[in-house]
A protein has these predicted regions:
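Divalent metal-cofactor coordination and adjacent catalytic microenvironments
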Residues: 1-283
């Protein structure tokens, strides 16, 4: 999974760093912090285009799902998914109790009353195939990204690793961006040129026209802040073994259980205090 839930600019801003010497180190720390958040929450907040398979059932409990491209079932277990569901065949439920019909991401599917099918291939192992967009995203929208800038030159090669843009005011290394249907991950920025990883998170590298819009992926503010907090603490911990609290300008953090449990204690200390409500039970 590509993506950091806080940009390099976010982390450097808290640390008060303006030099670029440690940019790669900070980016890698922010990436590691993001994966720690994923592991802690039992879910990922980056979005991934993928096809996933599930055992058949009357109701389907799913990993976080933002959009369904196709849903097919194999009713007779012959490994051919002969039934293609339409949106009126199922009902999507999100988190919560009172408002689960109106929340994202989707975590459960049930057969609608007027469906042509009685179940999702109930009783058939690997009886369900779902192609779609997976992940928590920003927890609000099925399209968790915002328009930011445009390309100033077409991208004509599938292997090109740079793209020229109109402005970089809101862009930073560590961000995941979307151009057309392709996700890219920003490694670095020089003037108005981005160096990127192409076709990340299940998307394919593609060509793009000049003036194509560029979008920046968004995450819940609590998740972004937790990533900043954890990245700052991990960065400081490199040279300050044993330090449990620090104040940097108006920013401060306090760690518990760090001496006893090392880095694991640091991670749990920060995440327990900030994003416990995002944890999902394993199923």
């Amino acid at each position: 999974m590509f993506g950091s839930y806080a940009s390099i600019a976010d982390v450097k801003g808290v640390l008060g760093i303006t030099a670029t010497t440690d940019d790669v180190t900070i980016r890698k720390i922010a990436e590691a912090a993001s994966r720690s958040i994923d592991n802690y929450c039992n879910r990922h907040f980056a979005t991934q285009s993928a096809t996933k398979y599930f055992d058949g059932a009357r109701a389907l409990w799913l990993p976080d799902l933002l959009d369904i491209t196709t849903l097919k079932t194999d009713e007779d277990g012959d490994a051919t998914f002969e039934n293609t569901f339409v949106t009126t065949d199922y009902i999507k439920y999100g988190h919560g109790l009172e408002d689960s019909l109106n929340t994202l991401p989707t975590t459960r599917l049930e057969i609608s009353h007027d469906s042509d099918y009685g179940s999702f291939a109930s009783g058939v192992k690997k009886g369900v195939e779902i192609a779609g967009l997976w992940g928590y995203g920003d927890g609000i929208s099925a399209t968790p990204y915002v328009l930011d800038t445009t390309l100033t030159a077409a991208i004509t090669s599938l292997t090109a690793l740079t793209c020229a843009v109109t402005a970089v005011t809101n862009l930073s290394a560590g961000q995941t961006i979307l151009i057309d249907t392709e996700q890219m991950y920003i490694y670095s920025i020089a003037t108005l040129t981005l160096t990127v990883e192409r076709g990340v998170n299940g998307t394919d590298a593609a060509t793009h026209l000049i003036n194509a819009p560029l979008y920046i992926y968004q995450y819940p503010s609590d998740i972004r802040q937790a990533c900043i907090d954890l990245s700052v603490a991990l960065y400081q911990l490199r040279n300050k073994k044993g330090v449990q609290s620090e104040k940097i300008g108006d920013y401060s953090y306090t760690l518990t259980n760090v001496t006893a449990q090392g880095q694991k204690g640091l991670i749990e200390s920060i995440l327990d205090s900030s994003i416990r409500s995002y944890k999902r039970m394993r199923f």
